[in-house]
């Protein structure tokens, strides 16, 4: 019996202006290609889910829990959506990212490994023992 370890990755789709200047027919093709890609990855057991995000939201920050508008949709760096992948390794996640139909139109796909919760616990334990100072390892 073979045991294969799988890893979790997020594909973060950046840029909300990729569709500017597309004709309705071009836009429909991209959306159809995108949905077919998503459904194929789900059928292969590689994508557990994902969603587009609304263009704008709120940002909560700081000790005072300040709420501000943003991030702003016009940014090429704004996160437009995500997929949650379970794949063999980072190389497979990157190969999947390269298949994104939006790349041809200016989208950016960021591939990020999902941290194991135990690494967060280990970091907290190091803080409590004084092994980490100033928030840096």
Predicted regions and their residues:
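Conserved, structured core segments of small domains
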Residues: 1-137
């Amino acid at each position: 019996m073979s045991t294969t370890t799988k890893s979790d990755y997020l594909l973060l789709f950046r840029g909300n202006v990729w569709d500017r200047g597309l004709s309705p027919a071009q836009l429909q093709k991209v959306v159809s290609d995108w949905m077919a890609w998503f459904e194929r990855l789900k059928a292969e057991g590689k994508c557990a889910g994902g969603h587009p995000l609304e263009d704008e939201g709120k940002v909560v920050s700081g000790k005072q829990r300040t709420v501000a508008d943003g991030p702003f949709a016009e940014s090429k760096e704004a996160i437009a959506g995500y997929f949650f992948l379970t794949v063999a390794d980072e190389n497979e996640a990157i190969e999947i990212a390269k298949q994104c139909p939006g790349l041809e139109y200016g989208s950016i796909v960021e591939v990020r490994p999902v941290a194991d919760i135990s690494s967060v616990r280990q970091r907290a334990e190091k803080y409590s023992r004084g092994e980490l100072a100033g928030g840096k390892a």
